[in-house]
Amino acid sequence: VLSPADKTNVKASWEKLGGHGAAYGAEALERMFLSFPTTKTYFPHFDLSHGSAQLQGHGKKVADALANAAAHVDDLPGALSALSDLHAHKLRVDPVNFKLLSHCLLVTLAAHLPADFTPAVHASLDKFLASVSTVLTSKYR
């Protein structure tokens, strides 16, 4: 459960991304594909090379979804319902992949926002991403 301090940290962190959300989302995806090659199986039709338009486009989708979740942190199930349906019923993404992407997002944010990535912010973002992952996998059951 996200505390009031966690929610404040999450919202502040997402505001600090500014116009870089899409680039950071793409970088996190690229990190995931390089570190965990089995995750590429869900993207057989994508050009996964560095800087590809498809990678950038999906990075933007990830960043936009997380920005929406951060803006609606008090109602994650409502904010992510359509994405949960998509990933569970149509795409059938293995739930472990959400944890892998969450880890890569944390690494990316830490690399780009080192002064802001305090232990408290790290913990808050980790809890937030775990909550997002839980919601996204809730319809698998």
Curated annotation (Swiss-Prot):
Q: Which organism is it from?
A: Otospermophilus beecheyi
GO molecular function terms listed in the Swiss-Prot or TrEMBL record:
haptoglobin binding; heme binding; iron ion binding; organic acid binding; oxygen binding; oxygen carrier activity; peroxidase activity
List residues modified as N6-succinyllysine: K7, K11, K16, K40
Q: CDD domains, per this entry?
A: Hb-alpha-like
GO cellular-component term (any): haptoglobin-hemoglobin complex
Which organs or tissues contain this protein? Red blood cells.
Q: Which InterPro entries match?
A: Globin (IPR000971), Globin-like_sf (IPR009050), Globin/Proto (IPR012292), Hemoglobin_a-typ (IPR002338), Hemoglobin_oxygen_transport (IPR050056), Hemoglobin_pi (IPR002339)
Residue list for modification Phosphoserine: S3, S35, S49, S102, S124, S131, S138
Question: What name appears for this protein in its UniProt entry?
Answer: Hemoglobin subunit alpha
